[in-house]
Amino acid sequence: MKLFFFLYTFGLVQTIFGVEIKQGFKWNKILYEGDTSENFNPDNNILTAFAYDPESQKLFLTVPRKYPETMYTLAEVDTEKNSFESGDTSPLLGKFSGHETGKELTSVYQPVIDECHRLWVVDVGSVERNSDGTEGQPEHNPTLVAYDLKEANYPEVIRYTFPDNSIEKPTFLGGFAVDVVKPDECSETFVYITNFLTNALIVYDHKNKDSWTVQDSTFGPDKKSKFDHDGQQYEYEAGIFGITLGERDNEGNRQAYYLVASSTKLHSINTKELKQKGSKVNANYLGDRGESTDAIGLVYDPKTKTIFFVESNSKRVSCWNTQETLNKDKIDVIYHNADFSFGTDISIDSQDNLWFLANGLPPLENSDKFVFTKPRYQIFKVNIQEAIAGTKCEKNL
């Protein structure tokens, strides 16, 4: 390793709106356990998303291969051995335990853990850029893969390769949600994957090993989004990006809430329509969150009936209780910090903790080259009920 990196230190706990928000991990550069090639450049490794599993105490992280030399596109941190409570806030990323070489996947952007304790990723099948003199990764059709976290060494249990030409521009796939129709019947599962360039939703039917594309006018941007960095303002346009699922009805159907990256509106579609190939979808307009609330990530908590949004340029995390009509007056803020640059991922673990990530990477060309004087990658953790206590989102608890 020829490059030296400096980690900035600051408090592990920040008090925002009366609640302690624990900063889990922070990195200014992403480095890996083990040897790296002489072509390794940590600036080419961009952390995009994560999923935490309390049972194994593993934090799974995705680092898409923008360049082939990225060591692991799916990595993990053992939080029992590398505990941020004990001050180990910038651990090296290790190889995913279900892999032998770390080269089993070409490039992934997000991990999701479902109710059957499976870890899902979408391997987009291609590297964004090529570097001269570096052995390239094999290219293939986008592939959906799941691993069983209940078993030792996390064996691969699902692999579905999407048909030729069924997904346009796979490196522009955004977030996805895994819909286990009946928690006690894991075979009946659907996956909904967003594409923020083509403004489409890709549906995978696991039971029938089939997939199809859904499009709707509400999936596209309705304005230009702004991103401020280092005294300059940038603009971008991106379509449907974040998606989360509400509560099941008696037939196992739910509302799929979704965000368009360049919009402040929120919509939903009943999964009954998404699960029927060729069915016409009827999008529900739920309301507008207000000026400068653009976001690409959201998550629904069934216990508090609250949706949390990790916002793009406001440097904050907000909430809305779904029992209320959505408008700017019903939105509240649970976290705000000037160093939180471009919130990109948010999730809830099985112990009712809310986790969220900023990575300073808006969908702008060469945004991976932005320079940060504070840690670029910041992961935070907070108990949900503590987070919404005293806010507009606390209702009927």
Swiss-Prot record:
GO terms for cellular component: extracellular region. The keyword Secreted applies. Residues 1-18 form the signal peptide. It is found in: Secreted. Gene3D superfamilies: TolB, C-terminal domain. Salivary gland (at protein level). The keyword Signal applies. Keywords: Secreted, Signal. Its main location: secreted. Probably modulates blood feeding of sand flies on vertebrate species by binding and sequestering different mediators involved in the host response. Binds biogenic amines. Binds adrenaline and noradrenaline with high affinity. Binds serotonin. Binds dopamine and octopamine. Exhibits anti-inflammatory effects in the host: reduces IL17A, TNF-alpha (TNF) and IFN-gamma (IFNG) production by host lymph node cells, suppresses expression of MHC-II and CD86, reduces TNF-alpha production and increases IL10 production, in host bone marrow-derived dendritic cells (BMDCs) stimulated by lipopolysaccharides. Belongs to the major royal jelly protein family. This is Yellow-related salivary protein LJM111.
